A protein has these predicted regions:
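Short, acidic, small-residue-rich periplasmic hinge/interaction motif at the N-terminus
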Residues: 22-58, 95
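Gram-negative outer-membrane beta-barrel transporters
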Residues: 403-407, 500-504, 523-613
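Membrane-embedded beta-barrel scaffold of Gram-negative outer-membrane proteins
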Residues: 301-319, 437, 443-445, 472-530, ...
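Periplasmic-side early beta-strands and strand-to-turn transitions of outer-membrane beta-barrels
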Residues: 159, 167, 182-283
Length: 627
């Protein structure tokens, strides 16, 4: 009876939101006329960019950004399911080669160099785009694969507005969404909240185990796959986002963004674990606070912006075992604290409609302490597990963009980076694009850049396994592509593109097992990552209020170790790097009528290897799969 009331209450709450959204949905479904790319923003000259529209971001507010990227882009999203670690990699690189920014501030974990996209609800993101390969140099350094750019917008409806949505899913999964906004001529204020929880307890057939069937003489006469329960996958995630924007109406804009995360997640046991799940506790907790304070001064042909930010992250991992009834022994009590201070200043100037100049400088100061409270931290003055380090990271760039004619554009970017006390060599990038046929908006793009990436703090200092002698990753990347867009207003729209990329990276960092029983990072002398990216979109409006929308993408991403053998027994040279799929694809189909929609999603990743030798062994090979 309680669940029935709960469901009815949810339907009553959701229905007004759905009904009020019908007009908005109809406007979204309208197919606009095709624009002429000669009027493209000069900031995007030569840039390989994938932008997600509001329909993709808000089609299901219960999704995380990991889900959005999986089914709407060509990047590789490695995920273990909802409320579990989800990372993103471009073009045959690793997740630590992907830079992520939120409202301009880089949010990669300085310990790991990567970002967990399962902790980013799409409900909190208003703008999202991907900058592929060399295009990331326009925004930041270190993105050997690319950049995921996330942000929020200050636009809210006038007056006071409130929204509440509740979702109910399988295995007693509940999602709560709330937003309160106030808008006036000068003030835009928004408060958003998301709370998701589930015991995530369900039955399944474990195909990774076999149970023997014996006769009376203890002879094996058969086998079967047991039915088990996922008893250690519960999660509770709370997100709060506060935004305040003020427009002086005299060219100045002030903004404050503050985002709080409180996550409590159990980590499921391996499907090959024959232990009793009730005898173990495997739990990860996280509390993160991110804030950005911004000021922008905007005039007709120039802009000046200043930002300051702060990130605090506390993470805990606990592994306990019940050694006797009601007697639990703590095996691991890992604790990490990260404090990051951020500052940035940028300027834009356009003296004429043919020229556009930018300058940018940013700083991140990281303070990290990592330890296991179950282990003595010092042995004769030397740490056994964990570390306590700080590092400052500086990045600056200048760019000049020139459009001699409407159909041709060129851009030069110069970037400089410093990590700790070490400066990177100058990072140059050149971009060019041109419209070769106004009919069909056929555009060619090409770019070349140098890129440079410093090791993460874990790469250098993590114990056991860190390698303080690691060299920095560096190399050159080349891009070329063609895109088109044709259509007829309110009838159909077809767009697509093909991009080729080629990267030669020296001293590539990869974590590999050692004979000492733990993993350790090392440099691979040379890696050649190359391939193609294909994307296409078709929207057809067969009748009034109807829309058929198809989005597809495909990536071919060989990432080959072309270095020298580390030993006579080394079989990794000439092989695909571990954990990197060579092929990936996604497809999303939508059939819409007014505010109703039927969706189909499909994603595919080819086989991956967990060993650098690419051996087809039980533990060294992951078969291809699709969702």
């Amino acid at each position: 009876m309680t669940y029935t009331k709960y469901l009815l209450f949810s339907i009553l709450v959701v229905c007004p939101s759905v009904l009020s959204a019908q007009g908005i949905t109809r406007r979204i479904h309208q197919i606009d006329e095709v624009t002429v790319w000669g009027k493209r923003p000069m900031k995007e000259i030569g840039v390989q960019k994938t932008k997600f529209d509001s329909l993709a971001l808000k089609e299901n507010i219960a999704l995380s950004m990991a889900d959005i990227l999986t089914f709407n882009s060509s990047v590789f999203v490695k995920s273990y399911g909802r409320a579990t670690l989800s990372t993103v990699a471009f073009r045959g690189t690793s997740p630590s080669h992907t830079q992520v920014t939120w409202n301009g501030m880089r949010i990669n974990n300085p310990m790991l160099g990567m970002t967990d996209f399962s902790t980013i609800p799409s409900y909190f993101i208003d703008n999202a785009s991907l900058l592929h390969g060399t295009s990331s140099v326009n925004e930041t350094g270190g993105g050997l694969g690319g950049l995921v750019k996330l942000g929020t917008t200050p636009t809210v409806a006038e007056g006071f507005n409130a929204q509440y949505v509740q979702g109910i899913g399988s295995f007693r999964t509940f999602d709560e969404f709330a937003r309160f906004t106030y808008g006036s001529e000068r003030w835009h204020i928004s408060t958003r909240a998301v709370y998701s929880s589930s015991p995530n307890d369900y039955k399944y057939t474990n195909h990774d185990k076999k149970i023997n069937i014996y006769d009376e003489d203890k002879n094996i006469i058969g086998q079967y796959h047991p039915k088990e329960r996922n008893r250690s996958g519960a999660f509770k995630d709370l997100h709060l986002l506060q935004e305040v924007y003020y427009n002086t109406r005299k060219g100045d804009k002030l903004g404050l963004n503050a985002w709080y995360i409180n996550s409590n997640r159990e980590l499921p046991m391996l499907t090959t674990d024959y232990g009793d799940a009730t005898d173990f506790e495997n739990r990860q907790r996280e509390q993160t606070f991110r804030s950005v304070l911004s000021w922008d001064h905007i005039k007709s042909n120039w802009k000046l912006g200043v930002k300051g930010g702060y990130i605090h992250t506390w993470m805990a991992y606990d592994y306990k075992r019940e050694v006797a009834p009601d007697n639990w022994a703590s095996m691991t009590r890992s604790r990490s604290k990260v404090n990051t201070f951020y500052g940035q200043a940028e300027g834009e100037y356009s003296p004429t409609k043919r020229w556009f100049f930018t300058a940018n400088v940013s700083a991140h100061q990281h303070l990290v302490r990592s330890e296991d409270k179950n282990i003595i931290l010092q042995d004769g003055g030397k740490a056994i597990v964990g570390y306590d380090k700080g590092r400052v990271e500086l990045s600056g760039s200048v760019s000049a963009k020139w459009q001699p004619i409407d159909r041709l554009g060129m851009s030069v970017v110069l970037r400089e980076e410093m990590y700790g006390s070490e400066w990177a060599p100058l990072i140059p990038a050149f971009f060019i694009d041109g419209i070769i046929s106004p009919k069909g908006n056929v555009m060619l793009k090409a770019s070349v850049s140098r890129n440079y990436r410093f090791p993460t703090l874990n790469d250098l200092y993590f114990l056991p396994g860190g390698n303080p002698n690691l060299r920095n990753e560096h190399g050159f990347s080349y891009d070329a592509g063609v895109s088109f867009e044709v259509g007829k207003e309110n009838v159909y729209k077809l767009s697509g593109g093909v991009n080729w990329f080629d990267s030669y990276i020296d001293d590539w960092i990869i974590w590999l097992p050692t004979t000492k029983g733990f993993f350790s990072p090392r440099n691979v002398k040379k890696v050649h990552a190359y391939g193609i990216e294909v994307k296409a979109n078709l929207a057809v409006q067969p009748a009034k209020d109807w829309l058929i929308d198809l989005n597809g993408s495909y990536s071919w991403t060989p990432s080959i170790n072309e270095g020298e053998k580390m030993s006579p027994a080394d079989q990794s040279v000439g092989k695909q790097l571990p954990y990197v799929p060579e092929h990936s694809a996604s497809l999303t189909g939508r059939l819409s009528w007014r505010s109703w929609a039927f969706l189909y999603k499909w994603a595919f990743y080819s086989e991956r290897f967990t060993m650098s030798s690419n051996d087809y062994t039980l533990t060294g090979h992951l078969p291809e799969y699709f969702m």
